[in-house]
UniProtKB/Swiss-Prot annotation:
GO terms for molecular function: rRNA (guanine-N7-)-methyltransferase activity. It comes from Janthinobacterium sp. (strain Marseille) (Minibacterium massiliensis). Transmembrane segments: none annotated. The gene is rsmG. The lineage of its organism: Bacteria, Pseudomonadati, Pseudomonadota, Betaproteobacteria, Burkholderiales. This is Ribosomal RNA small subunit methyltransferase G. CDD domains: AdoMet_MTases.
């Protein structure tokens, strides 16, 4: 792994946030870099991400997730399915702690080493708006239903919906983070579900396509 140059990474993050028109506080910037440092440290043993270069991690992890956060502005209870190393859930939690302090983010993954990492991040960064669960989402009975369920690089859209629809509140929506526009996946959605919007995202310094897919129940 390349050296973790905190000042340089901070400059890159601050500029990227500015390009996204996000007004992040100094405390939020510090927590995001702290999170990245934890990921880089744990990644050598736990293989949380294939991205090893901290500069690329700022772009492909932090800015990639930050580009999506405004879509969650009206959410109260969010579930991040297949949370992995914490994307977008941890980034969303750091942003929401100041921007939307009423928001709560639950994160679920089947892999214990990943939820152990998320639990450590929650503790070290004092993220009181985060809950972490180790379970299969299709078998999980949550303490409450969620108005937004999200995922990043988790599964085909049809599987994503089928496995977690019992957890979505009435009137809730899915927000899936995808690369290229998933036209084939959209066409394969199960009956009773519709795509409300596919929104292209521009991620600073990333030369790749990113899209948000908004899915909701079909109104009869």
């Amino acid at each position: 792994m390349k050296a973790f140059d905190r000042p340089a990474l901070t400059v890159l993050l601050v500029q990227g946030a500015r390009d996204l028109s996000l007004n992040l506080s100094e405390a939020q910037i510090t927590k995001l870099i702290d999170y990245l440092a934890l990921m880089a440290k744990w990644n050598s043993v736990y293989n949380l991400t294939a991205v090893r270069d901290p500069v690329q991690m700022v772009t492909q992890h932090l800015l990639d997730s930050l580009a999506a956060v405004s879509a969650f502005s009206n959410a109260k209870n969010v579930l991040d399915v297949g949370a992995g190393g914490g994307l977008p859930g941890i980034v969303l939690a750091i942003w929401a702690a100041e921007a939307h302090p009423e928001m709560r983010i639950s994160m679920i993954d089947t892999v214990h080493k990943k939820t152990a990492f998320l639990t450590q991040v929650k503790a070290e960064l004092n993220l009181s708006n985060v809950s972490v669960y180790t379970a299969r989402v299709e078998q999980w009975q949550a303490p409450q239903k969620f108005d937004v369920i999200t995922s990043r690089a988790f599964a085909d859209l049809s599987d994503f919906v089928n496995w977690s629809e019992h957890l979505l509140a009435d009137g809730g929506q899915y927000i899936a983070l995808k690369g290229v526009a998933p036209d084939t996946e959209v066409a394969g959605l199960p009956a009773g579900w519709q795509v409300r919007e596919v929104r292209a995202l521009q991620v600073p310094t990333l030369q790749a396509e990113r899209h948000l897919v908004f899915i909701e129940r079909t109104v009869l």
